[in-house]
């Protein structure tokens, strides 16, 4: 992908040179105030004559994150990984803007839910997808990348490969890499068992060349951190989690399933 310098009003940055899209529509969406808000940004998907675009605006002083996502997306692509194609990136003072083309494919959670249907064929396909997930995360780390927030919604499954979304906190370097395994594993997912979670870790450990002792140490560490995150996020007392055990804590449809707990409270 080739990029050229771009400026409009007080915006300065780069745009894709050979892709048709409406810059004015994207800027209007960025300034419109709509979309999903997160801690550092606001995201909005918009329909255009050229397809779906994702507009992510970063209020001051977090505009540097837009440039980081742009740079990391290109670095990932150069290393053989799939990431959304940036159409437009810019700064306005200390605010930032990132516009990407829709990555296509299927959300990881949607793919797993689809493969949770009964039947030996579906079960085999689900297990294969989970093994591929562990192997791909290992490949990411081996290439020197650590994703900033590798939760399932930030992964797409497209044409037999994973696409890494939201790369504004992705960085190079090994320290903290195993945290990605905690981010992936802390979600309660329909149709995913404790054995399925272990399958991801085994594939990861195998691809990283870990021996049995190091594999067991990694698994125990990831399990402890997942339990701690569940307790912190969902306000589960540590003593309650310890009594219930990991399987019950992470079982879809179980007493600690956040979806069921929310429904009961409603």
Specify the residue positions occupied by each region the protein language model found.
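Hydrophobic residue at the +6 position relative to the catalytic HRD Asp in the kinase catalytic loop
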Residues: 150-157
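Short, glycine/acidic-enriched loop or turn micro-motifs at the edges of active sites
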Residues: 104, 152, 169
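Short alpha-helical scaffold element within the canonical Hanks-type protein kinase domain
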Residues: 126-130
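Conserved protein kinase catalytic core
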Residues: 62, 107, 155, 172-173
């Amino acid at each position: 992908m080739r990029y050229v310098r771009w400026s409009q009003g007080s915006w300065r940055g780069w745009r894709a040179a050979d892709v048709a899209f409406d810059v004015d529509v994207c800027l209007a969406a960025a300034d419109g105030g709509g979309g999903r808000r997160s801690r550092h940004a606001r995201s909005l998907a918009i329909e255009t004559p050229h397809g779906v675009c994702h507009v992510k605006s970063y209020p001051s002083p977090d505009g540097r994150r837009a440039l980081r996502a742009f740079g990391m997306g290109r670095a990932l692509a150069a290393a053989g990984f799939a990431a959304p194609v940036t159409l437009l990136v810019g700064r306005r003072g200390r605010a930032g803007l990132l516009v990407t083309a829709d990555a296509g494919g299927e959300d990881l959670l949607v793919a797993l839910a689809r493969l949770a249907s009964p039947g030996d064929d579906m079960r085999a396909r689900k297990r294969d997808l989970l093994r591929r997930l562990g192997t791909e995360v290992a490949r990411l780390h081996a290439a020197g990348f650590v994703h900033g927030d590798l939760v399932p919604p930030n992964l797409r499954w497209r044409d037999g490969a994973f696409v890494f979304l939201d790369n504004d906190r992705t960085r190079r370097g090994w320290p903290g890499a195993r945290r990605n395994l905690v981010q992936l594993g802390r979600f309660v997912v329909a149709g995913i068992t404790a054995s399925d979670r272990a399958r991801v870790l085994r594939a990861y450990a195998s691809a990283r060349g870990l021996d049995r002792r190091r594999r067991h140490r990694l698994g125990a560490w990831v399990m402890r951190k997942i339990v701690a995150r569940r307790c912190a996020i969902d306000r589960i007392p540590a003593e309650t989690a310890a009594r219930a055990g990991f399987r019950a804590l992470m079982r879809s449809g179980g007493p600690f399933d956040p979806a069921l707990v929310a429904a009961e409270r409603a």
